[in-house]
Amino acid sequence: MLVCNSCPRGNRPLLTRGPTIPYELTKMLSLLLYPLNQALLLALIALLAMIFHWPRMAFWSLLLGVTWLYLCSTLFFADYLMGTLEDSYTPKAMSVTPDADAIVLLGGAIRGDTHMGSLGDLNQQADRLVHALALYKAGKAPRILVSGGGQPGARSEAEIMYDLLTLMGVPPHAIMQENASRDTYQNAVYTAVMLEKLGINKILLVTSAFHMRRAEALFKAQGLEVIPAPTDYQRLVGPKTMPGWLPAVSDLWQSTYALHEIIGYWVYRYQGKL
């Protein structure tokens, strides 16, 4: 088992040409881009406008906030946003999936340390773990690299995913750990360092379909040959059980995921990371 806790860059240059933003600030700013927080901010502006006797500003701020929150909470809008991310990555049968030198499994499927103890707790993106296991069992690559560092709790995502994969029958020698990354950009950078040392260039990249556009671009920017292996599709296909105009918490959550990815992609483009 190969483990990377700090992943020195070696001779590979950091591909950042634009301005960088500190990680903690990025996470804080991303919260302001969530539809619920935007609606609350507009409601606060409306309240302040009423206090200062600016009725026109109060009216339009409140109307904009309510309209935006409603729109993001509807199935038709959430599906539209997800479609812009997922439709380019249609699922492929295992029989037509190309072979590669390694499967790279990105973190995001672990909630962190919970009452379940050292194995952590899987979240709604657990399909990533299952899909990577299926690719390995199908003989598509001889090893799996799990990438994921900081998360709530004492252990990294990579450590927890390693334990889960070995529990499901993957031999320890076939799993590599990258424990240092804190975001998708670092996933790509640190993984590329590890794979370069092993002479590996062709990978099957496993992540959620809505996350694939950003992830694929970042890994390709590191010089890797990437075969997308998307999973965890969110956009509903076929007949809908509920009218698309009715708001629902699940649709608001889906819109939030999609907007996070769309904005994150363009922020990385602006920073020169893609």
Please name every model-derived segment.
Residues 9-21:
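Short, Lys/Arg-enriched N-terminal segments with co-localized hydrophobic residues
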Residues 21-29, 77, 81-85, 259-266:
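Hydrophobic alpha-helical segments of integral membrane proteins
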Residues 50-58:
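Membrane-interface helix-boundary motifs at transmembrane edges
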Residues 66, 71-249:
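A structural signal for short, hydrophobic/glycine-enriched beta-strand patches
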